[in-house]
């Protein structure tokens, strides 16, 4: 059975971003460069005007174009022509002004072409360099994280910790292993991770001395690979990434302290932290409204369904074994009231399954793939409370049939 792989639409591809910025910079420099004397430049401007007028006359005979496109196109060209004319008038001024113009042109040519073009893909903020742009995008993680939980930007699922969010984001990637969002290197396995790093980014000499002592200092392939660090947000980064280490130095002390503490966290401290997170999650769920609970459950079900679609046979076998062990332990410690409620739920599930088995094959497949249809079917079956005996079940079914007949007669 084929498993459909889904991509993460919020993944930042730095190579594509900077390639587009460099192309924009080159185009901007080419547009401001007009070789030749002033007479030839004026002839070029006149040719542009003639082309614009001829194209506007021939547009009505050729393909159909909207009025908005034509007006925006002509306004942009007219604006460019007026701008060039103003520059030429300034160039015809005395020698002092001409020197100033030439000095500005040479300054623009020798400056960084990416200056002012390093825009954040999330908020369109201009950054001075690539390092500042990467650090700024990392700051967006504070906007993603709320005071209570960590929200997935793809499906909106609420998770209790940054590590859980990072592991959850893998189900939205192209495969189970993603690429580093800071340096852009794709890793397909733990063995080939270091060899597939970008050499211009992963320079060992540029590593900070404060972090070069740990096991994740990227000194060679003989060092054991440590699990990746997933920060609190939409970025997936790796421990061995030098760009990520530089990025950590630019963050606030609290963020650096959090990342270092997670890397060197002992087992007992980790267990205590997980217990605190579970307690906080339980208290948060106890205080949520019924609408919030329903939305959370729908998000969890959808995320679990997507995750199970992408798991392998070995992962599925391990998950089923864990579920059986947990179910056995839970049933051994449940109270009589919880056992009665569980039996009622199982009885409802069996009724729903038998109802689906009586349907047509195509309709059954449609119901199985549509969660809203399944919810509607369950709501229809639960129109009355689950009875205790079969006699009450028959009486309630008869009452429901009579109620439906009354509604149909009133409609006719």
Curated annotation (Swiss-Prot):
Chain spans, region Disordered: 26-83, 278-319
GO terms for MF: DNA-binding transcription factor activity; RNA polymerase II cis-regulatory region sequence-specific DNA binding; zinc ion binding
Signal peptide: none
C2H2-type ZnF: 116-140, 150-172
Transcription recorded as keyword: yes
Keyword DNA-binding among UniProt keywords: yes
Annotated localization: Nucleus
Acidic residues: bias regions: 58-67
Keywords for this protein: Coiled coil, DNA-binding, Metal-binding, Nucleus, Repeat, Transcription, Transcription regulation, Zinc, Zinc-finger
Coiled-coil ranges per UniProt: 257-366
GO cellular component: nucleus
GO BP terms, alphabetized: regulation of transcription by RNA polymerase II
Function: May be involved in transcriptional regulation.
PANTHER family referenced in this protein's UniProt entry, alphabetically: C2H2-TYPE DOMAIN-CONTAINING PROTEIN (PTHR24399:SF23), ZINC FINGER AND BTB DOMAIN-CONTAINING (PTHR24399)
Protein family according to the UniProt entry: Belongs to the krueppel C2H2-type zinc-finger protein family.
Identification of the protein by name: Zinc finger protein 821
Name of the gene encoding the protein in the UniProt record: ZNF821
């Amino acid at each position: 059975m084929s498993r459909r792989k889904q991509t993460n639409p919020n993944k930042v591809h730095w190579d594509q971003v900077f390639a587009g910025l460099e192309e924009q910079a080159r185009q901007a420099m080419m547009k401001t460069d007009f070789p030749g004397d002033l007479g030839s430049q004026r002839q070029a401007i006149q040719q542009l005007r003639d082309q614009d007028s001829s194209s506007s006359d021939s547009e009505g005979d050729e393909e159909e174009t909207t009025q908005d496109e034509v007006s925006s196109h002509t306004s942009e060209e007219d604006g460019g022509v007026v701008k060039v004319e103003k520059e030429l008038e300034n160039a015809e001024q005395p020698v002092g002004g001409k020197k100033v113009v030439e000095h500005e042109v040479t300054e623009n040519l020798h400056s960084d072409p990416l200056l002012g073009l390093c825009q954040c893909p999330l908020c369109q903020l201009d950054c001075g360099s690539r390092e500042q742009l990467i650090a700024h995008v990392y700051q967006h993680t504070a906007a993603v994280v709320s005071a209570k939980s960590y929200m997935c930007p793809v499906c909106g699922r609420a998770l209790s910790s940054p590590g859980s969010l990072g592991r959850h984001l893998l189900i939205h990637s192209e495969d189970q292993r993603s690429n580093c969002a800071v340096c852009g290197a794709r890793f397909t396995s733990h063995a080939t991770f270091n060899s597939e790093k970008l050499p211009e980014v992963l320079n060992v000499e540029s590593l900070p001395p404060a972090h070069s002592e740990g096991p994740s200092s990227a000194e060679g392939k003989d060092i054991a690979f440590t699990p990746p660090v997933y920060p609190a947000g939409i970025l997936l980064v790796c421990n061995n990434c030098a760009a990520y280490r530089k990025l950590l130095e630019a963050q606030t002390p609290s963020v650096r302290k959090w990342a270092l503490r997670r890397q060197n966290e002992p087992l007992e401290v980790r267990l205590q932290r997980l217990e605190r997170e579970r307690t906080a999650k339980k208290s948060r769920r106890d205080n949520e409204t019924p609408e919030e609970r329903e939305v959370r459950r729908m998000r969890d079900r959808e995320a679990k369904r997507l995750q199970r679609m992408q798991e392998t046979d070995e992962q599925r076998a391990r998950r089923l074994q864990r579920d059986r062990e947990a179910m056995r332990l839970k049933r051994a410690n449940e109270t009589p009231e919880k056992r009665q409620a569980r039996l009622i739920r199982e009885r409802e599930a069996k009724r729903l399954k038998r109802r689906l088995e009586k349907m047509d094959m195509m309709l059954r497949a449609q119901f199985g793939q549509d969660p809203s249809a399944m919810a509607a079917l369950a709501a229809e079956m639960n129109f009355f409370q689950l009875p205790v005996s079969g006699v009450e079940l028959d009486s309630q079914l008869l009452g429901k049939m009579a109620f439906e007949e009354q509604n149909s007669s009133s409609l006719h």
